[in-house]
Amino acid sequence: MSVRHRVSLFALVVLLPLAQAAFAQTPTIDYVVSAPQPEQRWLQVDVRFPARAGTPLDVRMARSSPGRYATHEFGKNVYLFEARGAGEAVLPVEQVAPAHWRVTPTDGVVRVRYRLFADHIDGTYSAVDGTHAHLNAPATFVWAPALPETPITVRFVQPPGRNWRVSTQLFPTDDPLAFTAPNLQYLMDSPVEFSAHAVREFTVAYPGGGTPARIRLAVHHLGTEAQLDAYAAMVETIVREQAAIFGTLPTFDGGTYTFLMDYLPWADGDGMEHRNSTVCTAAASLADGMARVAGTASHEFFHAWNVERIRPASLEPFDFSQANMSGELWLAEGFTSYYGSLAMIRAGIVAQDRGVAQLAMFAGAVMRAPGAQFRSAVDMSRLAPYVDAAQAVDPTNWENTYVSYYTYGAAIGLGLDLTLRERSGGTVTLDDYMRTLWKTHGVPGGKAPGYVSRPYTLKDAEAALATVSGDAAFAADFFRRHVLGTEPLPFRRLFAAAGYTLRERETPPTLGTLGLTAQQGRMVVTNNTVATSAVYKAGVGRGDTILSLNGTAVTQAGDWERILSTLTPGTEVELAFESRGEKKTARVTVQSNDRVEAIPMAERTPQQEALRAAWLASRVK
């Protein structure tokens, strides 16, 4: 047999099966993230996409992010974008749109490389510097719309001279710097902290037994080990208190939930929920007040149930190419705000009366906001693409036409909780409502990590209330008046049922918030005046100049407040101002501040005591 024949036989016997095995393997999308010069705030991202020779492959940068509802042009920070095939030959790249590239491969691979400028530490964006890489996936990774279910690998490269660790909800491998995601939805929902951060962890058992859930805190901060120990213990009380509301923790993918926390002077304050993790950032340190930053952790952890698994159909699956509008954010975000605060009270981190005073701020904001008469909670939710960290150059009138769906929804959650307790004698609560949503829409899970099989609609949310209350007419009426409509809840009566008086706060006299700023020797109004204020009724608007109040000139910072402090609510005074070049005067009536507060009643009935205790006491057994 000749050598040529022997080689051919080898090829048939050995190489062909290997080739067939390689062909049979599921193709993957492979990312490599490196930071050769982290101090200069840029990352290098290399991606290998499987492709078909001759078939164009579209590659995009996301324009929205899970947990955010506005458009965010992440592509603006991408540069030096290039593509190659399996070899080193550069492939032509057609830029179809600002964050949309098209590459036609000559073989079965498209390899993309680009640089990403990243210098904003919060939940939405990405950041890299000499101390860490803090990554939100949609702000970091390009993706191929044609490959939504292709498995993914992500590998991180240590920056020069560093020995960082990676914390993320991505699935680990034997390599501590390499991870996987089963699909695009899961990748884009998986933030990363790559730094020399500290880690604390604890476990929480499931009622039915099995492997306990592992809860990790990955904390990049400048504090002490003792401070972190104390903070981890505080977060543990929150986690256990929230688990008691539902009776169980969610089944986390991989068995672990991770708090990714950056408490650094150069960070922005933020929180962003994800399926098996959350990002919490603040410029505050643990020494500045743990309860303050723990409030964000409480809100975000409640999202592990509410929004991540009890998920609006309007957000499932998430569309990374545009803003995702949802009419359910009053429930997804607003009820989470309510329970984030309530859990802090039940866990004993915030004193009960102080905590109720904070909850009353939700009610007060909706009671006094002009915008609440124009739009329902559903309407406010649908405005999120315009307001959720969205940017606008032209002025808006949100002061008079908008109430945050966080606040509006929290007020509805508060009012519904007290309503259910009052009408049932304490046998039915909002906890029961959340458990019903959980069993119906959360427990069924999804076809794969990153998906939810039974997302809910507004009709589903109403049906759950009918089930819990045992009264479909009540549920329909509540939704018609307070969710789809703009009728306010009877908060004074509801707080009284729990032994609290809701009243106007005693505050300094006011004519309305002006936001005065000195500009070229003139005191200029820099914000829209609020429709319920005296200055609004007088015709004062943004850009106008205040000349005098009650006969005294207003020429520098502090003059306005100083003059107001000498006046009495109910008094009528003269206001002089200039609007669009025209000098005007108006008679205005001094007002008291329109904020409300909850004051514990000195004497409470047994019924009030029972409702208050059941509402605010710990559920942990």
State each model region's role.
Residues 113-200:
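Extended, low-hydrophobicity, Ser/Thr/Pro/Gly-biased non-transmembrane segments
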Residues 42-75, 139-159, 166:
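Surface-exposed beta-strand/loop patches in extracellular or lumenal glycoproteins
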Residues 74-83, 117, 149-167, 171, ...:
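Zn2+-dependent metallopeptidase catalytic core
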Residues 340-341, 350-621:
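C-terminal recognition in membrane/secretory proteostasis and scaffolding
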Residues 278, 285, 309-310, 321-374:
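Post-HExxH zinc-binding segment in Zn-dependent metallohydrolases
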Residues 203-329:
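Juxtacatalytic substrate-recognition/specificity segment
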Residues 45-51, 61-63, 99-130, 152-160, ...:
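Short, hydrophobic/aromatic-enriched beta-strand segments in well-ordered soluble domains
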Residues 35-36, 67-129, 144:
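A surface-exposed beta-strand-loop module
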